[in-house]
């Protein structure tokens, strides 16, 4: 599947997604709650856009599937996150919630496989938060490719594209595209149950029911493979999960090898043993004096004997 591949045909199921977590991206957050709400395109194609200056929020489709779970994050929630979501690590532990694990990934996979394909995940600010965070959680389990057959879109980009051209003032305040602001702008009231995963998913569905057929056309043209999303963060560990040694473990033994005995194999250039012909501590060449002196003495003795034999001819 290419990095710019579009779905093989019209998206059949929109999977509205929201995650609550322990904090912002810089803190390497962990998921505390997730909700997926699956709606078939048939449920949206037959809808008419809400009418009037402040229409009431539409009722969700009668036929939909929903998966909502709280998750033990394994780290402390930031005070701000706990205040917004109403969840804390202690509360989740007290309720016996389990971690984001392989069983949960299988549950998500099973939920998706019950829906007609192609699937498209839809999340508000998904490109910057929900999708990268979900990819990070999958990667930590070694299951980074578990959802690679899904597609995804960020509903903020969709709403900006679908908004009427003259709806924003060039000189007025910058229009907010937070989920609460968009919902209030469309329906004249704040969304119920904000900052719960299920409440935000239902609010997002209501927003997408504003111009449902135009939304479906935009999704078909702009959905991207979930496999192209980069994880929000990557955590490397040294306790059996990373087969490659770190720089520290690779260099420290080599540094110690030159300072220890010959049993270590780090020193590949052992010093040669002293020659048996050399006296330890003597200058080179001094060991040759003894044999040279003996040779000179024998030569002198032979010469003297030869001289004596010449001096005694009568014998």
Swiss-Prot record:
Lineage: Eukaryota, Metazoa, Chordata, Craniata, Vertebrata
Active site, UniProt feature: 195 (proton donor/acceptor)
Stretch list, region Necessary for endoplasmic reticulum localization: 236-315
Segments of this protein annotated with the region Necessary for cytoplasmic retention: 282-315
Protein's recorded name: Three-prime repair exonuclease 1
Gene Ontology biological-process entries: DNA catabolic process; DNA metabolic process; negative regulation of innate immune response
CC per GO annotation: cytoplasm; cytosol; endoplasmic reticulum membrane; nucleus
InterPro entries found in the cross-reference section: Exonuclease_RNaseT/DNA_pol3, RNaseH-like_sf, RNaseH_sf, TREX1/2
Record localization: Nucleus; Cytoplasm, Cytosol; Endoplasmic reticulum membrane
Phosphoserine modification, residue list: 78, 167
Oligomer and partners: Homodimer. Interacts (via proline-rich region) with TCERG1/CA150 (via the second WW domain). Component of the SET complex, composed of at least ANP32A, APEX1, HMGB2, NME1, SET and TREX1. Within this complex, directly interacts with SET; this interaction does not result in TREX1 inhibition. Also interacts with NME1, but only following translocation to the nucleus. Directly interacts with UBQLN1 (via ubiquitin-like domain); the interaction may control TREX1 subcellular location.
Residues annotated as binding Mg(2+) 2: 18
Cofactor(s) needed for function: Mg(2+)
Region ranges (Disordered): 256-282
EC number, as in UniProt: 3.1.11.2
Residues holding substrate: 20-21, 129, 200
Keywords: Cell cycle, Cytoplasm, Endoplasmic reticulum, Exonuclease, Hydrolase, Magnesium, Membrane, Metal-binding, Nuclease, Nucleus, Phosphoprotein, Ubl conjugation
SUPFAM superfamilies: Ribonuclease H-like (SSF53098)
Binding, Mg(2+) 1: 18, 20, 200
């Amino acid at each position: 599947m290419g990095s710019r591949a579009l779905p093989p045909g019209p998206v059949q199921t929109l999977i509205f997604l929201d995650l609550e977590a322990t904090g912002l991206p810089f803190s390497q957050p962990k998921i505390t709650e997730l909700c997926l709400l699956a709606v078939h395109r048939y449920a949206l194609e037959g809808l008419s856009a809400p009418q009037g200056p402040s229409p009431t929020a539409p009722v969700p489709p009668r036929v939909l599937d929903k998966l909502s779970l709280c998750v033990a994050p394994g780290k402390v929630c930031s005070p701000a996150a706990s205040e917004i979501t109403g969840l804390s690590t202690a509360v989740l532990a007290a309720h016996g919630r389990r971690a984001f694990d392989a069983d949960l990934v299988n549950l998500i996979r099973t939920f998706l496989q019950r829906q007609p394909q192609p699937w498209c995940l839809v999340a508000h600010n998904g490109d910057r938060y929900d999708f990268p965070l979900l990819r990070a959680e999958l990667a930590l389990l070694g299951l980074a490719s578990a959802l690679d057959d899904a597609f995804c879109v960020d509903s903020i980009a969709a709403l900006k594209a679908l908004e009427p051209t003259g709806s924003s003032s060039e000189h007025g305040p910058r229009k907010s595209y937070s989920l609460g602001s968009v919902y209030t702008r469309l329906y004249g009231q704040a969304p119920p149950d904000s900052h719960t995963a299920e409440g935000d998913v239902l609010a997002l569905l209501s927003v997408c029911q504003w111009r449902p057929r135009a939304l479906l056309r935009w999704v078909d043209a702009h959905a991207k493979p979930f496999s192209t999303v980069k994880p929000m963060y990557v955590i490397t560990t040294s306790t059996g999960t990373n087969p490659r040694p770190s720089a520290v473990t690779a260099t420290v033994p080599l540094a110690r090898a030159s300072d220890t005995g010959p049993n270590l194999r780090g020193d590949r250039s052992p010093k040669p043993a002293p020659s048996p012909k050399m006296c330890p501590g003597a200058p080179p060449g001094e060991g040759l004096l003894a044999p040279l002196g003996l040779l000179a003495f024998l030569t002198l003795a032979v010469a003297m004997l030869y001289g004596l034999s010449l001096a005694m001819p009568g014998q």
